[in-house]
Curated annotation (Swiss-Prot):
Single GO MF annotation: electron transporter, transferring electrons within the cyclic electron transport pathway of photosynthesis activity
UniProt xrefs under SUPFAM superfamilies: Photosystem II antenna protein-like (SSF161077)
Protein name: Photosystem II CP47 reaction center protein
Chain ranges passing through the membrane: 21-36, 101-115, 140-156, 203-218, 237-252, 457-472
Entry membrane topology: Multi-pass membrane protein
UniProt entry tagged with the keyword Membrane: yes
Cofactor note: Binds multiple chlorophylls. PSII binds additional chlorophylls, carotenoids and specific lipids.
Keyword Iron tagged: no
Pfam families: PSII (PF00421)
Gene3D superfamilies from the UniProt entry: Photosystem II CP47 reaction center protein
Length: 508
């Protein structure tokens, strides 16, 4: 046919059989990618330390999505929470991956069959004998089936009525596990961090989809609406489908980046706003304060802080710190976290407790400044030592660790104090293994960042695709040069205003 590469989809115009074939093949590719990617991730995933080396630190992309839907066991004998199991059952990570690959193969065969046997009777209009599709009826069928799937997911899978439930955790990502969820029918269901909203919204949306599908199956569109919205044109279907996809992509980009019940931090890592707002730091200080109120020592109070909570309060886990084009997992950046060194408390020779000012998200370097409880600068690591007034040496800063591996250890050597002050800029201090993966020390983003960037980018691209194909289908006759007033003869010079018959010139 000699079509240019950007017009090759023309071959499925007016060919319903092969239109179906290419869509089945597309499904085969999507399912095949998902299954293959899952097997690859399982081959490289290390489940041994779910606290300091969780899936999101290792750059896992599809494992978190399987996990949030109820898959936690592997045929390798491990559980995602760190335990060992003897009977993982068929729906393990490998089982789901295998099911996707088998499904992909069946779709591949079905696509070939429909490509070869494209001229089926079902696609022929009995009145004209030509291939045609009843698009409003097909819309009704798809809406009905999507509604059934949506309702079933919300009413059975999420609630645990017939299914595992979904991943549910506390606000600080410490106690996450798979559990059944009751639908939230009150106003709390609209809170994006309430898991019950997932069940209730799927039930409600599914019910609406079923009713709307039945409506479109039983009621024909009015002729003027059919013609006005070009319902007989397959490009209208393409345009509106792209609209649905880009809208969904924008929504999930938002829920992923800003966080929600569907994007738990245990599976996708913390959000950047949790670092910006000192979210975990405040909870840590609250717990320490509660411990001190119970007459615990500082050492005892800090020792009771979960290592998992301390690890969230580290800038290396902020998805906005990694550049978009720095390939690799977080572990390839700052290394594999081995252990929490403890919380450093700095004091000057006058006895003031000093706090290191933390690095904001979008800084690569930041001055080391230590302030007291009132925010007054008491010490720093100066750029020019000749002009310094607050250097660690001059102020006599010491550091003492509470909790973690260095619990009870103190340092007064200025070089060591400055080393830990620099590291305290980045949040809680962890020992990081850079040798194993040859990590380069440059921060990487988490799967939360990659997912957001990918979906926001494609949503923008698909938005333009929707506008493009929508305009093509609405103004198809204009673009083809078919003008409804084509029969009106316009003669240059016959009117004072070109084409305006009310300004016809008088013949002298």
């Amino acid at each position: 046919m000699g079509l240019p590469w950007y017009r090759v989809h023309t071959v499925v115009l007016n060919d319903p059989g092969r239109l179906l074939s290419v869509h089945i093949m597309h499904t085969a590719l999507v399912a095949g990618w998902a299954g293959s990617m899952a097997l690859y991730e399982l081959a490289v995933f290390d489940p041994s330390d779910p606290v300091l080396d969780p899936m999101w630190r290792q750059g896992m992309f599809v494992i978190p999505f399987m996990t949030r839907l109820g898959i936690t066991n592997s045929w390798g004998g491990w559980n995602i929470t760190g335990g060992t199991i003897t009977n993982p059952g068929i729906w393990s990570y490998e089982g789901v991956a295998g099911a996707h690959i088998v499904f992909s193969g069946l779709c591949f065969l079905a696509a070939i069959w429909h490509w070869v046997y494209w001229d089926l009777e079902i696609f022929c209009d009995e009145r004209t004998g030509k291939p045609s599709l009843d698009l409003p009826k097909i819309f009704g069928i798809h809406l009905f089936l999507a509604g059934v799937a949506c309702f079933g997911f919300g009413a059975f899978h999420v609630t645990g009525l017939y299914g595992p439930g979904i991943w549910v955790s506390d606000p600080y990502g410490l106690t996450g596990r798979i559990q059944s969820v009751n639908p939230a029918w009150g106003v709390e269901g609209f809170d994006p961090f309430v898991p019950g909203g997932v069940a209730s919204h799927h039930i409600a949306a599914g019910t609406l989809g079923i009713l709307a599908g039945l409506f479109h199956l039983s009621v024909r569109p009015p002729q003027r609406l059919y013609k006005g919205l070009r319902m007989g044109n397959i490009e209208t279907v393409l345009s509106s489908s792209i609209a649905a996809v880009f809208f969904a992509a924008f929504v999930v980009a938002g829920t992923m980046w800003y966080g929600s019940a569907t994007t738990p931090i245990e599976l996708f890592g913390p959000t950047r706003y949790q670092w910006d707002q000192g979210y975990f730091q405040q909870e840590i200080y609250r717990r320490v304060g509660a411990g001190l109120a119970e007459n615990q020592s500082l050492s005892e109070a800090w020792s009771k802080i979960p290592e998992k909570l301390a690890f969230y309060d580290y800038i290396g886990n902020n998805p906005a710190k990694g550049g978009l084009f720095r390939a690799g997992s977080m572990d390839n950046g700052d290394g594999i976290a081995v252990g929490w060194l403890g919380h450093p408390v700095f004091r000057d020779k006058e006895g003031h407790e000093l706090f290191v000012r933390r690095m904001p998200t979008f800084f690569e370097t930041f001055p080391v400044v230590l302030v007291d409880g009132d925010g007054i600068v008491r010490a720093d690591v100066p750029f020019r030592r000749a002009e310094s007034k607050y250097s660690v040496e001059q102020v006599g800063v010491i550091v003492e660790f509470y909790g973690g591996e260095l619990n009870g250890v103190s340092y007064s050597d200025p070089a060591t104090v400055k080393k830990y002050a620099r590291r305290a800029q980045l949040g809680e201090i962890f020992e990081l293994d850079r040798a194993t993966l040859k990590s380069d020390g440059v921060f990487r983003s988490s799967p939360r960042g990659w997912f957001t960037f990918g979906h926001a980018s494609f949503a923008l691209l698909f938005f333009f695709g929707h506008i493009w194909h929508g305009a093509r289908t609405l103004f198809r006759d204009v673009f083809a040069g078919i003008d409804p007033d084509l029969d009106a003869q316009v003669e240059f010079g016959a009117f004072q205003k070109l084409g305006d018959p009310t300004t016809k010139k008088q013949v002298v």
